[in-house]
Amino acid sequence: IQGEGRGHLTQALSLRQKLMAEGHEIVGVLVGKSPARRLPDFFLNKIQSPVYLFESPNFLPTAKNKQVSLMRSVLYNVLRLHKYMGSIRYIDRMIRQTDADVVVNFYELLTGLTYLILRPKATMVCIAHQYLFLHPDFVFPKQSTLSLASLRFFTRLTAIGSVKKLALSFRKMREAPLGGIVVVPPLLRQEVLDAVPSNGSYLHGYLLNSGFSEEIRSWHSRHPSVPMHFFWDKKDQRAEVKIDDCLSFHQLDDTLFLRYM
């Protein structure tokens, strides 16, 4: 699992529920770790399978933690190539030691490179919304040709050796057999399906980069009467940072997030 994306972690939890309900066994969960982020407690508590961490390439944020610093990220990852080779060998060893029949890859780059270099025998299936980028009918917003080519190239790297790519989408799209792409709905946990919606009177969201809290606070100063509850995974912060009666930042907690949603 690519540990950078909280969405990949929650999708893995959803898949776990479905697999266990069908009588399958999950022999291990490998997560690419990053010094910039920590694994949320809700994932570690609810995955209920052995979790193994390995060092994986990641994008470093700028000083204000609002966006990716491309130059810093490239230099950082180049200097750590020897560690990533160790991670590739570790992934291969864990696949063999657990005797897994199927490897499910949630957009982790090193899994694709493991299948390129060491060719594990276990069948691999990839799951992520990003595999829509490879679908022939997917229409991108206008942006640079180089950016699109880079994004598609990275996505293909994660799926090297896979027999199928499950592209998550709320919209129905045809299968693309030549690319091994099957479009499926997002994986929803049973807790979401069991939740009873009610009317709310606040804005709700998740900050991938905690630096954007500055923009939230700025908007709040202009609209002080609008209640807002935002979630982040900012290190060394308490469970709830209450700015005032109308603005709170919560540490990422899946149960609380679903309740507010």
Task: Pin down the residues of each PLM region.
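A short, glycine/small-residue-rich beta-strand->loop->alpha-helix junction that serves as a flexible
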Residues: 1-13
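Short, polar loop motifs at secondary-structure junctions
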Residues: 31-37, 107-110, 168-173, 230-240
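An aromatic- and histidine-rich active-site surface loop
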Residues: 38, 103-118
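Structural motif
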Residues: 101-102, 164, 202
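Donor-nucleotide binding loops and adjacent catalytic segments primarily
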Residues: 185-192, 196-261
